[in-house]
Amino acid sequence: MARTMRSRVVAGAVACAMSIAPFAGTTAVMTLATTHAAMAATAPADGYAATRYPIILVHGLSGTDKYAGVVEYWYGIQEDLQQNGATVYVANLSGFQSDDGANGRGEQLLAYVKTVLAATGATKVNLVGHSQGGLTSRYVAAVAPDLVASVTTIGTPHRGSEFADFVQNVLAYDPTGLSSSVIAAFVNVFGILTSSSHNTNQDALAALQTLTTARAATYNQNYPSAGLGAPGSCQTGAPTETVGGNTHLLYSWAGTAIQPTLSVFGITGATDTSTVPLVDLANVLDPSTLALFGTGTVMINRGSGQNDGLVSKCSALYGKVLSTSYKWNHLDEINQLLGVRGAYAEDPVAVIRTHANRLKLAGV
């Protein structure tokens, strides 16, 4: 009976990951050059978001540039930035993979950065990463600091995720390891099918381990950044860093829609501050709203404090923290699902547009 219950919990966790999966395709130099020319021809005169260097949007776990080549991961965001004068590209990396190593997302992103630079003639890029995409962006900033002007992370688990710890612990109840293998195979196939390029470089177990709190601590040792606060603290670090003579501007923000409430018999309740209780349409039209409320409640009962359903406030702190008060869950941060969000949630498209202007005014 207990094993059956644990299996259901694991299945639920996987289903949750599928329901909240955000979407990204590596583009050839010729295609990028054509796109760059088209954007330059249509950029508005005022150039509110016209940064000096190109912006690359970097997706997180389970992502791609467009799910199945149709639904944008950064829903409506690339188009809005382009309409306001920005030169914007969207990376397409493995949806399920670690960030370091030869097959990792970091090396994939580095190759894409070089492709964008070759297509545009720029010398640097501004990296904007959501969720795991922030860790991937930090990798590139660490190993190729001369190619990066700024790193912005949105809802990134710099200290890992308590929900990843929870899933790993549940899987560990199976002494045979069969559950992990079967579920990982299923998730890997999901990653291949939803990738716009049907990328076969998928490793769900490596991705899960990357996002645990223990592995995040190791990652931070291997790829340190001045933007990180002291280990174990709920503090951010410096707003800039200089690596090999190259200065990077560092920014972050996050949603904290899931807030702890009262504790009864050792169990802490939670509330979703982004929605109107019972009547909010987001609960009906966006299945990820309730799913992330559930995962966020699990996190709170594992000591995370306020969170977005997958990443805690403390874990998301990095560089100059612009806000941790947005009433967003993890998908609201990228305007998912399909632009539906709770009645109290701010507009993420406007927030990212404003940040592009901030980068412009900072000279990058």
From Swiss-Prot:
Cofactor binding mode and count: Binds 1 Ca(2+) ion per subunit.
Q: Where is the active site?
A: 131 (nucleophile), 308 (charge relay system), 330 (charge relay system)
Tell me, what is one Gene Ontology molecular-function annotation carried by this entry? triacylglycerol lipase activity
Main localisation: secreted
What task does this protein carry out? Catalyzes the hydrolysis of triacylglycerol.
Oligomeric and partner information: Monomer.
- What is the name of the protein in this document? Triacylglycerol lipase
Source organism: Pseudomonas sp. (strain KWI-56)
Upper lineage is: Bacteria, Pseudomonadati, Pseudomonadota
Gene name as annotated: lip
